[in-house]
Curated annotation (Swiss-Prot):
Residues 65-143 are annotated as: Domain II. Belongs to the RuvA family. One of its GO terms (biological process) is DNA recombination. Pfam families: HHH_5 (PF14520), RuvA_C (PF07499), RuvA_N (PF01330). The keyword Metal-binding does not apply. This is Holliday junction branch migration complex subunit RuvA. Its main location: cytoplasm. Homotetramer. Forms an RuvA(8)-RuvB(12)-Holliday junction (HJ) complex. HJ DNA is sandwiched between 2 RuvA tetramers; dsDNA enters through RuvA and exits via RuvB. An RuvB hexamer assembles on each DNA strand where it exits the tetramer. Each RuvB hexamer is contacted by two RuvA subunits (via domain III) on 2 adjacent RuvB subunits; this complex drives branch migration. In the full resolvosome a probable DNA-RuvA(4)-RuvB(12)-RuvC(2) complex forms which resolves the HJ. It comes from the Bacteria. Residues 148-197 are annotated as: Domain III. InterPro entries: DNA_helicase_Holl-junc_RuvA_I, Hlx-hairpin-Hlx_DNA-bd_motif, NA-bd_OB-fold, RuvA, RuvA_2-like, RuvA_C, RuvA_C_sf. It comes from Chromobacterium violaceum (strain ATCC 12472 / DSM 30191 / JCM 1249 / CCUG 213 / NBRC 12614 / NCIMB 9131 / NCTC 9757 / MK). It is found in: Cytoplasm. Residues 143-147 are annotated as: Flexible linker.
Length: 197
């Protein structure tokens, strides 16, 4: 089992990153909450990982903290929730927000995540109640300290596509974003507008 990777971040394309560890590049899928916390390309980074072994592939999922990884592991134990949907959930809300939504039985908030219908949201509440703790340290950073360039706007669109939205929805959600929006703030605002629909 690969539990942690420490190396140099050499690629970033939401939701996947590549971490070079002693000359070996590991492809790792990460939730957007982790993606925003990653350093610039070429900088050292550490990810807590979960290795999923399938018949046709070995897949690595990375997280900024052990707590976020544990939340992911709890999510994939829920009937009908696979790794892709678990990443979408952790991309749409922090582990703390998920714990609060489950504890308060906020079906509307949970079913706003792409791929989660009302029945699945109810199952999440039923199967996760009492199993998720809020740690207070799993929040999305306020944003990057620079304005969104066209590349950053495409990062916002890519993030929405990775969360299960189609290109039309992603384009509509990013069309009205302010020109000076940061990537993390842009995704947050886009998700907020998509969840109102």
């Amino acid at each position: 089992m690969i539990g942690r990777l420490s190396g140099k971040l050499i690629e970033k394309l939401p939701p996947q990153v590549v971490v070079d560890v002693n000359g070996v590049g590991y492809e790792v899928d990460v939730p957007m909450t982790t993606f925003y916390q990653l350093p610039a390309l070429g900088q050292p980074c550490t990810l807590f990982t979960h290795l999923a072994v399938r018949e046709d592939a070995h897949l690595l999922y990375g997280f900024a903290s052990k707590e976020e990884r544990q939340t992911f592991r709890q999510l994939i134990k829920v009937t009908g929730i696979g790794a892709k949907i678990a990443l979408a959930i952790l991309s749409g809300m922090t582990a703390d927000e998920l714990a609060i939504a489950v504890a308060s039985e906020d079906i509307k908030r949970l079913s706003a995540v792409p791929g989660i219908g009302k029945k699945t949201a109810e199952r999440l509440v039923l199967e996760l109640r009492g199993k998720l703790a809020t740690g207070g340290n799993l929040t999305v950073p306020g944003g990057l300290p620079f304005a969104a360039t066209p590349d950053e706007k495409s990062d916002i669109v890519n993030a929405l596509l990775a969360l299960g939205y189609n290109e039309k929805e992603a384009a509509a959600a990013t069309k009205s974003l302010p020109a000076d929006v940061t990537v993390s703030e842009g995704v947050r605002l886009a998700l907020k507008s998509l969840m109102k629909v």
